[in-house]
């Protein structure tokens, strides 16, 4: 036997089998000869991780896209309903109805959060219905309240001055018709003029060119009389204007400002004057709204109210902001000017003093208070508030996500509420109306509310009303307008 026998066939290593074992399995898929000729590989499902990624991305993207599409459709539905009002032809001597819109930032948030809801869900419908409006915003608590109260006080002062002038004119007319004036002034003046020695001078001749110019008589330069344009509010004072408050906070400040203007004194009390003049830095440095550090440095934009109800002298005192037919022009001051901004005036009267306060004597015997343009003043116009569906906090993440994907519900709800304002369906103010948008307070941050109570913030206090003031007020009635939601709006025929 040889020392090195040849290995048997059964003991030879199976190289081909080992290669098959180490080779990865062929991925399952579907292939087509035509696709294979074009260089397209086999069509197969992606891996598990890619499946999770694409499923999540498609779900989120599809949900957002569907919600935005529905918002556009809802907005289009309401705009088509108001289209007959927008197609109405206006002559040069006619101006559409005007609303006043007050917007305040949500608690512990920026003003832009509130402006988004107005610009997306309210403003397009007002523009479609050809309704003019003025927008007033604030970044500090108390700006709206102070502006509304100051406007009413100036209106009361103007009424007092007009009453005094009327009394003086009546006394002068009575004196002119009396015998006292006849014997004291008329008779002496008659003899003085009769025996006056000074002779009259000849009337000086004046050239015709000094009296008038050729363009005063030529048709090319003929100037027509100025057009006296009138608003629709003047035609029917009972359905004039309206007030919209975006947010419960803006509504509270508006109502408090109306009460302060009608029940409070015309001049600041000694306590308020002392706080404002002696120690203004304390009021400036103490933020009434519990914003964070970054928000406390935000630029302040004071509301500028319309001057229709104010005397001519007080118009120059205000910082006039140019208004477009749809929205206020944003004139934002510099950051340095925001730091030097005057503090918000303290209220002239507190809610505890309402029962003992005297109602404005200037308006006690007046059934409907009108301004110079024969339009009811702001607190005689209907008011309504739009609640802000904004939640904050980590524990409310699930609610944030749900509302983020269902903004179409907010668009439809705001559209229904805006139809109330457009159709001008109003009713007298009742006790329950002071709780409008009360549900919004349940979603305010608890820490912010606690801080506001410590600093005696206006927003966290209960809204107190007085019957002497609310009997003059009206609100837009949602219940009546909801019944006529499906009915088309007819084109008005105002001549």
Curated annotation (Swiss-Prot):
The name this protein goes by in its record: Mitochondrial import inner membrane translocase subunit TIM54
Major site of localization recorded for this protein: mitochondrion
Topology in the lipid bilayer: Single-pass membrane protein
Name of the coding gene: TIM54
Localization: Mitochondrion inner membrane
Biased composition (Basic and acidic residues): 288-298
GO BP annotations, alphabetical order: protein transport
GO cellular component labels: mitochondrial inner membrane
Intervals, Mitochondrial matrix compartment: 1-49
Protein keywords: Membrane, Mitochondrion, Mitochondrion inner membrane, Protein transport, Translocation, Transmembrane, Transmembrane helix, Transport
The protein's role, per its UniProt record: Essential component of the TIM22 complex, a complex that mediates the import and insertion of multi-pass transmembrane proteins into the mitochondrial inner membrane. The TIM22 complex forms a twin-pore translocase that uses the membrane potential as external driving force.
Transmembrane portions of the chain: 50-66
InterPro entries: Lipid_Phosphate_FormReg (IPR050187), Mt_import_IM_translocase_Tim54 (IPR021056)
Quaternary structure and partners: Component of the TIM22 complex, whose core is composed of TIM22 and TIM54, associated with the 70 kDa heterohexamer composed of TIM9 and TIM10 (or TIM8 and TIM13).
Superkingdom assignment: Eukaryota
Residue ranges with Polar residues bias: 1-14, 325-334
Region (Disordered): 1-27, 280-299, 307-355
Family membership noted in the UniProt record: Belongs to the TIM54 family.
Pfam family membership, one: Tim54
Side Mitochondrial intermembrane, residues: 67-495
